[in-house]
Regions:
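Hydrophobic, membrane-embedded alpha-helices of multi-pass small-molecule transporters
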Residues: 12-22, 163-170, 178-245, 281-293
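Transmembrane alpha-helical segments of multi-pass small-molecule transport proteins
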Residues: 12, 17, 21, 49-50, ...
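Membrane-water interface regions at transmembrane-helix termini and the short interhelical loops
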Residues: 63-71, 128-149, 214-217
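Select transmembrane alpha-helical segments in multipass membrane proteins
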Residues: 7-17, 42, 79-92, 121-126, ...
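Transmembrane helix-boundary motif of multi-pass solute transporters/channels
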Residues: 10-48, 58-62, 66-72, 208, ...
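Extracellular loop-to-transmembrane helix junctions
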Residues: 4-8, 34-59, 75-84, 119-120, ...
Length: 299
């Protein structure tokens, strides 16, 4: 009898993969792109989707079909595999992506709790300790990320987007900035790559395979099929959430021109819509998203 994930378990695994992908960069870049692209928003969004969704999901599929990252890289050359694998793990791990999860989420808490090096150190220690404890059991990530944190994260983003639809800041997008005035799709591709999800996808495929095996699916082809399908679910969720964020960013950019980062764009939007509660909303979104990604990268 052919092994197959149930629809419910497949959805949970897809939610887990989405949670692992959707971190600091995924929150920052789409709204800033929307604010900068203005009336050229949708061509730029198409480019962003190629590099921030298409390539990462392709990485998950490639690793699923090969078995693991080392086997995939060995197709280039046996000596290339260990070097490439180490560089990928370093770049998405301790060198760049993991430290960014704590620093970015803390910055969103500063307006609520204040700043200071001591407070940031305490927060970082607690943040990484909690993430490490969860990541010790990579085969059980679906129980926390897929069942609890991912629905909470999506729900909070939907609340922000619903507020943007119910009380739009403006009826029109602004003119695009100079870099998006021509070839906005190409600029979107370059911008989307900065999420670093293309590299992360090469690592996450193996983690998702572990979660599928933990649900009783042990046959290689069945694990491969489940991983690929979970990748498409995660890609669909990313597409929907990015569309919300770029639209919200475009509206905010028209009212608040010159905002330097996506974090500033989201903060301005949330504060305009919900006041002080908006700051709490955005901080919660960033903390959950960054925690999910940190767990995935450590695992």
């Amino acid at each position: 009898m052919q092994q197959k994930l149930s629809g419910r378990n497949l959805l949970l695994v897809g939610f887990t993969l989405f949670s692992m992908f959707f971190g600091a960069g995924n929150l920052i870049f789409p709204p800033h792109l929307g604010a900068q692209a203005g009336t050229n928003l949708w061509p730029a969004f198409a480019g962003l989707s190629v590099s921030a969704i298409g390539l990462p999901i392709a990485g998950v599929v490639a690793v699923a079909r090969a078995g693991d990252l080392d086997k995939l890289a060995s197709r280039v050359h046996p000596l290339f595999a260990p070097v490439f694998t180490v560089l990928v793990y370093l770049s998405i791990g301790p060198c760049l992506a993991i430290p960014r999860t704590a620093s970015t989420s803390f910055q969103m808490l500063v307006p609520l709790v204040g700043g200071g090096a001591g407070l940031q150190l305490v927060y970082s220690v607690l943040f990484f300790t909690a993430a490490f404890c969860v990541a010790l059991h990579p085969d059980k990530l679906t129980d926390l990320l897929g069942r609890i944190l991912c629905p909470c994260l999506i729900g909070l983003i939907v609340v922000l987007f619903a507020g943007c639809l119910a009380h739009p800041l403006t009826a029109h997008y602004t003119a695009p900035s100079a870099e998006y005035a021509s070839l906005p799709a190409a600029q979107g591709i370059l911008y989307g790559y900065q999420t670093m999800d293309t590299l992360a996808g090469l690592n996450f495929g193996a983690v998702i395979a572990l979660n599928i095996r933990a649900r009783g699916i042990t046959e290689g082809p069945a694990v491969e099929r489940g991983t690929i399908r979970a990748g498409f679910i995660a890609g669909g969720l990313l597409l929907a959430v990015y569309a919300m964020l770029v639209h919200a960013g475009a509206q905010t950019g028209a009212v608040h021109p010159g905002l330097a980062t996506g974090a500033e764009v989201l903060t301005a939007l949330a504060q305009d819509l919900f006041g002080w509660a908006g700051l709490v909303l955005v901080a919660a979104i960033f903390v959950i998203a960054c925690f999910n990604t940190c767990v995935g990268l450590i695992a």
